[in-house]
């Protein structure tokens, strides 16, 4: 019984690990696209500096001061950032 539980747990860990590797591959592919093609970026994806509207949805803003990443990436907006984005007239895509 213990062996079956350990085996099942190992399979779950392996599935989660392979999914995270696939996510990293997708992020790299998006970085290679020209700016026009990635104008609508998801959270944690590259965005256009100074253009919060390039982060789609009301939940994202463009952050260019990430301590561990070079460049600009969409991040989850705080309450004040969401209001500012709404008043800027960004169209949610």
From Swiss-Prot:
One of its GO terms (cellular component) is extracellular region. Keywords: Disulfide bond, Secreted, Signal, Toxin. It is found in: Secreted. Expressed by the venom gland. Residues 1-18 form the signal peptide. Belongs to the neurotoxin 31 family. This is U12-lycotoxin-Ls1b. It comes from Lycosa singoriensis (Wolf spider).
């Amino acid at each position: 019984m213990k062996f079956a539980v350990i085996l099942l747990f190992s399979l779950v860990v392996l599935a989660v690990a392979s999914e995270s590797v696939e996510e990293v591959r997708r992020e790299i592919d998006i970085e290679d696209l020209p700016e026009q093609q990635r104008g609508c970026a998801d959270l944690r994806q590259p965005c256009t500096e100074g253009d919060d509207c390039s982060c789609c949805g009301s939940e994202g803003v463009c952050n260019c001061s990430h301590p561990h990443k070079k460049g600009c990436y969409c991040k989850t907006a705080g309450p004040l950032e969401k209001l500012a984005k709404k008043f800027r007239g960004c169209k949610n895509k």
